[in-house]
Curated annotation (Swiss-Prot):
The gene is rplI. It comes from the Bacteria. PANTHER family: 50S RIBOSOMAL PROTEIN L9. Binds to the 23S rRNA. Keywords: Ribonucleoprotein, Ribosomal protein, RNA-binding, rRNA-binding. This is Large ribosomal subunit protein bL9.
Amino acid sequence: MDVILLQRIKNLGKLGDKVSVKAGYGRNFLIPQGKAVAATEANTAAFEARRAELEKQEAEVLAAAQARAEQLNEVNIVITAKAGDEGKLFGSIGTRDIADSLTNAGLTVDRAEVRLPNGALRHTGEFNIAIQLHHDVVAEVLVTIVSE
């Protein structure tokens, strides 16, 4: 099944690409979610008429993400947690804890945007945490974990 993508989809394509996908993926996920339309002649013509509008929306989302990234790059947060003598935490600091700390600092960050590639943080110290705001925009936040 051929579809025209209405937004960037990881491992598939970007806005305006005409791609071939399995029929079930197109019918049951992409089209109902509004991420793609079937690549008929009528839809192709309608998409070309809306292309500028969709690209403008995409540019606005990117600009907003870049503005948020500039704010986040300047932020350092301190999280206190119970820890043993050697700096090992009783428990761990995960994406929710980091997102909540950033929200308490006055920034809106969803826990799904926080990237912890090595899993939850289990030791005291300073960590550079990546915040994926957009597929092209990643902010770095310095998180310091101190013992209570």
